[in-house]
Amino acid sequence: MMAIATGRPEVEAYYALNFFDLKKYFPIIYTLDDCIREEQKIYKEERVTLSLSKPNPFMLDAIAENVKEDCTGFFYVGDMPDDMIAASRSVSGFKGVGLLLSAPDRDGLKEDLIRVGADYVIENFEELRRIIEGR
């Protein structure tokens, strides 16, 4: 099962998913809007101000709580150090997978991702498939 946790607003995330007809592959989607709604709820109930955006693992743990099928593990694929920090802070045991595809300075990004705790760093999706399959 695949899910999305993005720091982008809902309108941006859904635009891309709908444009490329990908939404059907992601039954669970959390966006910046979900973080803001939960922050407002917490403030209203507890008068506490906090940020649930990454690197806070809120979205990842919410995804894990909403998974209805048996899972043997969780992987979080991201291209920023904050993504790996969120994975490592998750109480749900996410493994951080750093993706170098979008980086103009792949060596620098690889160092940053490893430094903040990436469990894996990959250059393509074939490597991701091997990780998930345990090879």
Task: Mark where each language-model region is.
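Proline-centered loop/turn at the N-terminus of a beta-strand
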Residues: 1-3, 95
